From Swiss-Prot:
Compartmental location: Cytoplasm
Primary gene name: mnmA
Name of the molecule in the record: tRNA-specific 2-thiouridylase MnmA
Matching SUPFAM superfamilies: Adenine nucleotide alpha hydrolases-like (SSF52402)
Keyword Signal recorded: no
Family: Belongs to the MnmA/TRMU family.
A Pfam family recorded for this sequence: tRNA_Me_trans
Domain of life of the native organism: Bacteria
GO molecular-function terms, A-Z: ATP binding; tRNA binding; tRNA-uridine 2-sulfurtransferase activity
Taxonomic classification: Bacteria, Pseudomonadati, Pseudomonadota, Gammaproteobacteria, Aeromonadales
Reaction(s) the record says it catalyses: S-sulfanyl-L-cysteinyl-[protein] + uridine(34) in tRNA + AH2 + ATP = 2-thiouridine(34) in tRNA + L-cysteinyl-[protein] + A + AMP + diphosphate + H(+)
Length: 368
């Protein structure tokens, strides 16, 4: 067995079950394990939602139980500058960003990684992400998590080989029920804690109310694909392609019973376009992506077949990548896809291996 006793690993302790069990598993593997709790958002005293203090208490309880030291660090300024301001800019532009991906890139695998190495003397960091690292080719590769239902490689496509090589993912080889079982056997306070959802580090606030604090709403018309105005939206930023709930336009006399869906956001006209049922305008033959990141840092310079996900937990879509230049690619799906959303990420796979991805700039209904 490898002697890990001289290797220090800093685990990002979120106060959740996955990072708790990750810390325990690393201890079992003989590493010197310490925890780090990151505070990345400054709570407003008037804000009803405040989980950071509870999460910190849970992380501390777990570290005490496991006999681990817990460090704390405040990355709120870095989060605001490098993640949140970009998030607001994207919403202002009528796009739908994914801040969790940017948070992983800028905070967890940059600010945290650098702090752990430089200030705490760590060889590795570890997180509770459901992904795997594979070193069998001589280059660290990012693989999907074993539990396909919890796989989080979609959120980590911006990692470089170097970052993957400096990171450990102890629960990536486990299924979620097994992780909970381990936590229960250890009687950890986080064993039955529900998984967090909502924006990375901002949590489960009412999204509309939260966004309204930072961006003034701009009401505008809701139009059918035929140009008929049938209602008013409170702001394009509150809507995303494929959305059917919360439109407030049901039960119209001149329409069928079929559900209404958002099929487009026309930012220049501040207009939300809707249609009933499986309307062709909701579907795309492909997309253009930019701001590309390849895990091995090698641009794709020739057409390549692989699979793509255009949102988390989506089934793999067989596709063809056609490079336009080193920064931009055209992606053609084998079959039309619904609700391909500008601002979201397209993430590419070769079997179990996460190749990388980019930001969806536009979708198209005929190859462009």
């Amino acid at each position: 067995m490898t002697d890990n006793s001289q290797i220090k690993v800093i685990v990002g302790m979120s106060g959740g079950v996955d990072s708790s069990v990750s810390a325990y598993l690393l201890q079992q593997q003989g590493y010197q394990v310490e925890g780090l709790f990151m505070k990345n958002w400054e709570e407003d005293d008037t804000d009803e939602y405040c989980s950071a203090s509870q999460d910190l208490a849970d992380a501390k309880a777990v570290c005490d139980k496991l006999g681990m030291k817990l460090h704390t660090i405040n990355f709120a300024a870095e989060y605001w500058d490098n993640v949140f301001e970009h998030f607001l800019e994207e919403y202002k532009a009528g796009r739908t960003p994914n801040p969790d991906i940017l948070c992983n890139k800028e905070i967890k695998f940059k600010a945290f990684l650098e702090f752990a190495a430089e200030e705490l003397g760590a060889t590795y960091i570890a997180t509770g992400h459901y992904v795997r690292r594979d070193d069998s080719t001589g280059h660290p590769r990012l693989l999907r998590g074993l539990d396909s239902n919890k796989d989080q490689s979609y959120f980590l496509y911006t990692l470089s080989e170097k970052q993957v090589g400096q990171s450990l993912f102890p629960v990536g080889d486990l299924e979620k029920p097994e992780v909970r079982r381990i936590a229960e056997q250890l009687d950890l306070i986080t064993a039955k804690k529900k998984d967090s959802t909502g924006i990375c580090f901002i949590g489960e606030r009412k999204f509309k109310d939260f966004l309204a604090k930072f961006l003034p709403a701009q009401p505008g018309p809701i139009e059918t694909v035929d140009g008929k105005v049938i209602g008013e939206h409170q702001g394009l930023m509150y809507h995303t392609l494929g959305q059917r709930k919360g439109l407030g336009i049901g039960g119209r006399k001149d329409a069928t019973e079929e559900a209404w869906y958002v099929v487009d956001k026309e930012v220049e006209r501040n207009t939300l376009v809707v249609a009933q049922g499986e309307h062709p305008r909701l579907y795309s033959d492909g997309l253009i992506a930019s701001q590309l990141h390849w895990v091995d840092r090698t641009p794709i310079r020739a057409p390549r077949r692989c699979t793509v996900k255009t949102r988390y937990r989506q089934q793999d879509i067989p596709c063809l990548i056609q490079p336009i230049d080193d920064e931009t690619i055209r992606v053609i799906f084998d079959e039309k896809q619904a609700a391909v959303t500008p601002g979201q990420s397209a993430v590419f796979y070769d079997g179990e291996v996460c190749l990388g991805g980019g930001i969806i700039e536009q979708r198209f209904s005929h190859p462009v």
